[in-house]
UniProtKB/Swiss-Prot annotation:
Species in which this protein is naturally found: Stenotrophomonas maltophilia (strain K279a)
Transmembrane segments: 16-36, 81-101
UniProt xrefs under SUPFAM superfamilies: Gated mechanosensitive channel
Name of the featured protein: Large-conductance mechanosensitive channel
Locations listed in the record: Cell inner membrane
Gene Ontology cellular component list: plasma membrane
Membrane protein topology class: Multi-pass membrane protein
Amino acid sequence: MGMLTEFKEFAMRGNVIDLAVGVVIGAAFGKIVTALVEKIIMPPLGLLIGKVDFSQLAWTLSPARIGPDGKEIPAVVIGYGDFINTLIQFVIVAFAIFIVVKAINRLSRKQEAAPAAPAEEVVLLREIRDSLKK
């Protein structure tokens, strides 16, 4: 078997395609969550806290200044507001994944709980056994 044929078989397996679809959907879901957090959740939360724009929260370690050569030296800041936004995004994604996994587990338990119908041979053998008992 040639390497190209083996690669084609590998790439066309269900798991690889499922993974690729999952990655694409995950990337799109990440953008949705980012927009949800930055545009819908954080503005009202910032308003409740006192008209705070979380993306602008930062600790200034060194203010911006003009250097000896006349060029501006930018401020050195720790932007913890973006970290708070990212943390909230993570919590939302983790909760969404938790809900999906919980639903999948519930469905798989229901499928396991349902007994499988006996094979036709078993049904036929039981009928023969029952008729011989009579």
